[in-house]
Amino acid sequence: MTRLFRRLTALMLTVLLLMSGVGAAQKNGTAFSDVPEDHWAARSVRWCAEYRLMNGIGGGKFGLGLTMTRAAYALTLCRLMGWELVSPDKGSFTDNQDTEKWYYSAIETAYTHGALTGESRLCRPDDAITREEMAMMTVRALGFGVLSGTAAADCPFTDVSVARGYIALAYRMGLIKGVSRYSFEPKATATREQAAAVLLRAYDRLHATLTLDYVEQAPEGSVQAESITEMSGSVPVSPRAPLESVYAAACRAGEGGSVTLYAVPLEQTTRGGVVTGSRTLTAEELSALLAAGNMRSHHSEQHQSSCVYRAEKDGSVVTVWYESAADVMEKLELCRLLGVSAVYVIK
């Protein structure tokens, strides 16, 4: 929940900053002498400059054809997501300890928000970023790296072995393309204009229009995200559609399609790990339970679903599952990134 709140807050701040800066950028001009108007990346370069996602290299030049470093890309992701830069006294990587370096705070901020991971003690800030690293960092920055395992089977490229799930997600979100139908060239280094193209696509996805409606039944043609139907193993287990199901539904719906989420509050009684009873609740009943204060709260990051529960004297456990506004927004954001134009929520 905290992760989602930080991301949504950052995105709102980004919108305000960009809205205040676009007019000035247009007035001052953002043309670079080394980017021809007919170049395939001219639009991406221009808008990334106007949105303050990327700067030139000086002298009125963008640096067309130059490689993008990992540190520079981390900084652009901080700008894309609107993250407030952090500057801890000690760096998180052995090669990011100089607090005076221009990229120190960007690296630490990207690490704080999960775009960079601590799997290695090195972040290699001056290395040219590869295409697979760019896909991985972008998907993580957007907050959906958790789906990389699920998405791995969707990767259409035969030359990808290490980051299949991340590349599949970036491809599904329309952020990055292959060099051919079945080739991605994951180890190839990315140029500054290629990075600009990915950043602008991510920006456009994040700000795409998506309709949210609360309905009593799924509209015809809308793809419903499947909920868990078999309850077994440890409890509590959310009967809601997990993010994996929302991802699958959004992929089936396709660009411009719609997805339906089932979010009617559900009360379950379990004993010994077995569901012994269940019933749906009205919004009024849910509000009363949440206000009662005699139940413990829990949140499933995997399923993006909330619950409250209490233990009864007979050893059973009563659990009430529901979707909070933040839960719905997380799934809504995933659908937006995957090109869905409408989400219907059954409550």
Regions of interest found by a model, annotated:
Residues G256, T260-K331:
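Glycan-binding loop/region signatures in secreted carbohydrate-active enzymes
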